[in-house]
Swiss-Prot record:
Mg(2+) binds at D71, E141. It holds the Pfam family CTP_synth_N. This is CTP synthase. GO terms for molecular function: ATP binding; CTP synthase activity; glutaminase activity; identical protein binding; metal ion binding. The active site is at C382 (nucleophile), H508, E510. The keyword Ligase applies. The keyword Metal-binding applies. CTPSs have evolved a hybrid strategy for distinguishing between UTP and CTP. The overlapping regions of the product feedback inhibitory and substrate sites recognize a common feature in both compounds, the triphosphate moiety. To differentiate isosteric substrate and product pyrimidine rings, an additional pocket far from the expected kinase/ligase catalytic site, specifically recognizes the cytosine and ribose portions of the product inhibitor. It comes from Staphylococcus carnosus (strain TM300). PANTHER family: CTP SYNTHASE (PTHR11550), CTP SYNTHASE-RELATED (PTHR11550:SF0). The lineage of its organism: Bacteria, Bacillati, Bacillota, Bacilli, Bacillales.
Length: 539
């Protein structure tokens, strides 16, 4: 039977519940267990797809096209699995589904209430995560902080699930903060005690407590937490601040967290903990030699979580070269043709990531022009590909005023236009072209050199696409369309052979990058940036 582990958090937000859950998933997977993981978010949006990146950070897209919380990116990268739409459940999605059922008459005229209707819907979503994957273990992170009013239905649902499935199939892990009071010169356990008391008041006794701390815990502190929170001392796990997120699984393993979980749930682990691959990765991360500077030109750079998967993918690509990636954050609203060199003269590569809306788009186009004209390695993702074709149309083809129809509906040259199937859609939420789609790669191109095969699959998130009316004209002037959809209708990749590395794609390759397996385009881009840097230094 599938076992269920619930990870809750107390005291403050941003404790690292997601990293804790992902790290535990990695440990259990390395013991030969199949693991899936999900996030319950208590906000009332149906999904984060229409939320501002300033509010939420990046939107992570799964293979089956779900727009989800960025924590799912951590889950996939740590555990090296591909998640599905059941891996992110919001209060908005739950309430919306319950209300649709009520309108259909599914409740036979009964009064619809939080208990049992909302809690039952939450439990159904929880069980679907296990049923859709046949996993040995489902790890569920509960978003928010214990005691938050909006998360109470989720807490109640996971309390009930213990009775539904029996105690031996359910485990609760609670993450708390152990603050250091500088004036007193000591760490305080009281916030942890009160957080656990709050959780117990809601009917949940944690089996294991993960304590986030800046400094090493003494045995006395562990004993005190164990006493007041009514758990064995060995079930108090220290989680120290770390320079690299990839240290966390090893921290937890040293304290036998996986052994405690396996024993508590009577899991049939096939192997002892080795983590050799993870230890090798961490050894590489801790011994990087030199750095490569990438100019990331975007409009949400004041909140770096808006580009989290892109940055992680860049780092992954640096590891085989033993290079650290220094991301230079460049606000595209400040970039113009006249000052682009000031912003970009010191970078080894330029990346324009995905985005929406007209604001700050001209600065991205200026950065792309600088990269093309100065032979600086360029990599464009989604909007970064669309604007690369806009820049080419304006400055190579001479089509003054060329633009994307999304950004300038009145443009005389709509190089980028609305997807045909989007013409009659009015709603914004959940209506993009989303998820994993195949592409065909043209032989004899940089794209083929990168992937080494004729067919690939990557994740997409877009509403607009390249307008094929301009394809022949661009090809005649040197732009190569190296990747297309299987029907040949949609452009997926473009490149400029006369430059050392000028490459862009409509899809989001960052979502499939792994720390031990860099995504091929990112790997090629960082290799090109490294060569560019070495050439500059040897001049």
């Amino acid at each position: 039977m599938t076992k269920f582990i619930f990870v809750t958090g107390g005291v403050v937000s941003s404790l690292g519940k997601g990293i804790t859950a992902a790290s535990l998933g990695r440990l259990l997977k390395d013991r030969g267990l199949s693991v899936t993981i999900q996030k319950f978010d208590p906000y009332l949006n149906v999904d984060p797809g229409t939320m501002s990146p300033y509010q939420h950070g990046e939107v992570f897209v799964t293979d089956d096209g779900a727009e989800t919380d960025l924590d799912l990116g951590h889950y996939e990268r740590f555990i090296d699995i591909n998640l599905n739409k059941y891996s992110n459940v919001t209060a908005g999605k739950v309430y919306s589904h319950v209300l649709k059922k009520e309108r259909r008459g599914d409740y036979l005229g009964g009064t619809v209430q939080v208990i049992p209707h909302i809690t039952n819907e939450i439990k159904e979503r929880l069980l679907l995560a296990g049923e859709s994957t046949n996993a040995d273990v489902v790890i569920t992170e509960i978003g928010g902080t214990t005691g938050d009013i909006e998360s109470l239905p989720f807490i109640e649902a996971i309390r009930q699930i213990r009775s539904d499935l029996s105690r031996e199939n359910v485990m609760y892990i609670h993450c708390t903060l152990l603050p250091f009071i500088k004036a007193a010169g000591e760490m305080k356990t009281k916030p942890t005690q009160h957080s656990v008391k709050e959780l117990r008041g809601l009917g949940i006794q944690p089996d294991l407590i993960v304590v986030r701390t800046e400094y090493e815990m003494t045995q006395d502190l562990k004993d005190k937490i164990a006493l007041f929170c009514d758990i064995p001392e060995q079930n108090v796990i220290e989680c120290r601040d770390a320079e690299s997120l990839y240290e966390i699984p090893l921290q937890l393993s040293k304290q036998h967290m996986d052994d405690l979980v396996i024993k508590r749930l009577d899991l049939n682990a096939k192997y002892d903990t080795q983590l050799d691959e993870w230890k090798h990765l961490l050894d590489v991360v801790n011994h990087l030699d030199g750095e490569i500077t990438i100019g990331l030109v975007g409009k949400y750079v004041s909140l770096q979580d808006a580009y989290l998967s892109v940055v992680e993918a860049l780092k992954h690509a640096g590891y085989p070269l033993h290079k650290d990636i220094n991301v230079k954050w460049i606000d595209s609203s400040e970039v113009t043709d006249e000052n682009a060199a000031e912003f970009l003269k010191d970078v080894d590569g330029i990346l324009v990531p995905g985005g929406f809306g007209y604001r700050a788009s001209e600065g991205k186009i200026s950065a792309i022009r600088y990269a093309r004209e100065n032979n600086v390695p360029y990599f464009g993702i989604c909007l970064g590909m669309q604007l690369a074709t806009v820049e080419f149309a304006r400055n190579v083809l001479g089509l003054e005023g060329a633009h994307s129809a999304e950004l300038d509906p009145e443009t005389p040259y709509p190089v980028i236009d609305l997807l045909p199937e989007q013409k009659d859609i009015e709603d914004l939420g959940g209506t993009l072209r989303l998820g994993l789609y195949p592409s065909e790669v043209k032989e004899g191109t940089l794209a083929y050199d990168i992937y080494g095969k004729k067919e690939i699959e990557e994740r997409h998130r877009h509403r607009y696409e390249f307008n094929n009316d301009y394809r022949e004209q661009m090809e005649d002037n040197g732009l190569v369309f190296s990747g297309v959809s299987p029907d040949g209708r949609r452009i997926e990749m473009v490149e400029l052979p006369k430059n050392d590395f000028f490459f862009a794609c409509q899809f989001h390759p960052e979502f499939l990058s792994r720390p031990n397996r860099p995504q091929p385009i990112f790997k090629a881009f960082i290799e090109a940036a490294n060569k560019y840097k070495e050439a500059k230094e040897n001049k």
